[in-house]
Amino acid sequence: RKINQWILNDDYILLLLSATKESTIYQNYMEQTTTSFAADRDFILDLFTEVIAPNEKLYDYLEDLKLTWVDDIPVVNTFIVKQLTALQSADQKWKLPKVYKDQEDQEYAQELFIKTVLNEKEFAGYFSDKTPNWDVDRIAELDTIILKMAICELLRFPSIPIKVTLNEYLELAKEYSTPKSSIFINGILDNLVKEFQANKKMQKIGRGLL
């Protein structure tokens, strides 16, 4: 979703401009008698991390505009910092990286989403009896989504190694879910992998055998 009519949102641009001008970072930068690409880059980086990213009014605006953006803000901020830090010289032709690494990456994401959604009841059934102390309805919604995606990858993506899948979804749990979610998810997936291997339900080929 893009903001197409900036004239309707210029109050927030002016707000950030005002915050920038009032910041010590900006004032110190403007007092410098000499400059360089490295100094300019560091100024922009400091300005973003100290003035723009923490701005509560901007955060509230983005939250009101689209609620789901709130979960993405930390990831986007980290991405921006990495991109600014990576800039090396003023004459380089810098381009904003694509959403997907390549066509294969895009196809994988789309296939994972479609297969997880179409088979979610089947995947939920695999771990419903692995949580004797928990009613499935009481498991955090994000944990159930992570589990379904992991099971989908284990069973429907034969070329992806088991270890890669386990590590990937444990990291997702640590990053986005509750503090104890990674332990909970690790226990369930570990038992499921053993079960899938025992009944030969999980078939890996090629790189997936690693």
Model regions: which residues?
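Class I Rossmann-like S-adenosyl-L-methionine
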Residues: 1-210
